[in-house]
């Protein structure tokens, strides 16, 4: 009985979706009205409400050769808002400059430490346990440990 109900449900489900697909088919007339040729061109046929946006578009246009800090008097940007925006941009660039570079070999160090098997440590020998601050416990190889020690010694 459950199989018959499942089959009936599937047939109703397919009938429901067939009816909806007809609305999405290409070629049927729609109620959408398209408006063409309203843009940022130099023609005088732009509507009156576009004048504010046109001034802003001239300011933001990628066609300008250089970005200057001069503001149009009829622009919809206010002077205080644009000044704050410029200051925010400077602060972001300063922040990016202050970030230290990521060491090149850092990702290699971490992948090696994940793949390395740990040897069982014996409790009888105190040498087998690395100290918590040792370079070996940080996942550094012998060669990177030697180069780090030599750099520290040369800086001191």
UniProtKB/Swiss-Prot annotation:
Residues 109-120 have a biased composition (Basic residues). Residues 26-39 form the CRIB domain. The gene is RIC11. Residues 87-156 are annotated as: Disordered. Functions as a downstream effector of Rho-related GTP binding proteins of the 'Rho of Plants' (ROPs) family. Participates in the propagation of ROP GTPase signals in specific cellular responses. Residues 121-142 have a biased composition (Low complexity). InterPro entries: CRIB_dom. PANTHER family: CRIB DOMAIN-CONTAINING PROTEIN RIC11, CRIB DOMAIN-CONTAINING PROTEIN RIC8. This is CRIB domain-containing protein RIC11. It comes from the Eukaryota.
